[in-house]
Amino acid sequence: MEFSELIRTGQAQAELLRGPEMPPLRGTLCVTGHHLLLSPGPQATPDLWLLLLRNVDSIEKRGQGTLSLSLSIPSVAGDAGTITLRCKDLRVLQLDIEGVEATLDIARSIEALSSLESVITSFPFFYRPKGLRLGEAWHFHPPERYYKRIARETWSSPLPVPQTRAWRLSEANEDFSLCPSYPRAVIVPRAVDDDALARSARFRQGGRFPVLSYYHAPRGTVLLRSSQPLTGPQKLRCAADEELLRAVLAEARPGARGFIVDTRSAQAAKQARMTGGGTEAKAAYPGWKRLHRPLERGRPLQESFVCLMEACGDPEQSMDRWLSRLDGCRWLSHVKEALSTACLAAQGMEWEGACILVHGAEGTDSTLLVTSLAQLILDPLSRTMAGFQELIEQEWIQAGHPFQLRCAHSAFSHTHPKHEAPIFLLFLDCVWQLGRQFPLSLEFGEGMLLALFDHSYASPFGTFLCNSEKERCLCEVRTRTHSLWSGLNQPKEQRKLRNPLYVPNPLAIWPSVEPQSLRLWQGLFLRWTHPPEPSEVAWEKVWQIATDQKTEGSQPTDSASEPQP
């Protein structure tokens, strides 16, 4: 199929309204296979306005007939139409276009081009920026890199030798036959062979058998993730699965115990058993205790996101109405529960010296939310720029979060939600809360989090394409597209992404989850409705102050790194 077949009208005269306190742009509007472009006239600024069509979440079109638009160019003020584009990055754009027929044709073209489902026809497969080479920055291989890090840490560990060399890198999933959503290599107990892994995979939903997510060197404990066991109504058991979790405790240290953090409610887990799922039986997994910490996912979380954006987009509501709607959408409640569950897992490892297994049902959503946040709390390396990028690769991209499904639509789509859910956005919001409470402990700033949000929904890079590593291999994403990290790590981008106040903090950071401690992330949810200039000026001032301090040889210190009551 040629893109030209979907373009009914290629260009028209138009005016673009972008938001408050932003001047309108007037010129020639052009539709291409992947972009919407507005080329200003010769008397205007030479800047070219560009919108990736994949960024369009919903489109509303109105034929105006003889409507007198609020335009200063007479060529558009008569027979005209209006297109309102609501974008996945939460922008709302209005295009006033000359000619009703041209308006409707352009709207239909945008609808068709923005909803193409084929991965290999998406823009990342055509994007060839200057200064970047294909294959560059696709060198992140978290299982291999992380295994080497564990080896270094265990060799220097004061724990007994037999208990610290207890993990191995398994390539049993080399052809993705064990688990299509896992990477080719995973870290598992050395005492468990690949045959046992295969049997355990058949006992777990989607083949997601327990694998190591994080090794906490100071206490010699581990964080694992998996999917639910397929016990079913008959309460089935799997000797290999039991052996795997028994080996985890045996190889941690003598007398070690474990906690299974189930991100479903006890009632939901019980209902799952009726459809073939279930939980680990106490008798079958001695030494492991199950804790239920329900986290919303799927449609309830998507509806919460939609309600929040509806409230943020209403400029005429009263203070009481705003506070009521903010409370009613329950978004900050989801943030609180996610951080609380991550703190529970981190406390179990740090304070109790316990091993932690996290799973829900599929193990690809709230499970990854908890394991990644727990690592940020405990691991200083995850709070560096490079470490955070590796965390995203390890715990989200290669761990099988289905970005293509979850980020198919944002908050404005008119279609009934199917697989969409802002799980990754919830993670980014939680990280923003950590950065706000510990302003010196993260090497990356809000700009990095905003960039990750934008690129997860629509990007010229291939990093967030597809739903699993298997799909990315089939589509040759790593050889035919550019990595997002290659773009973000360019020197000219780093000033916008880094935290100028960062000071390495070797301690765990324990966030407060009290209601008064959590804030609405205005930099994301209100960034297109509030003028950006004040925050941009403040950011540049912070950079200037931090640079002056470093020049004078003084550095700030972060005093908020101890657990809060």
Give names to the regions the model predicted.
Residues 224, 349, 353-376, 431:
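A phosphate-binding catalytic loop at a beta-strand-loop-alpha-helix junction
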Residues 2-82, 87-92, 96-100:
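Phosphoinositide-binding peripheral membrane targeting modules
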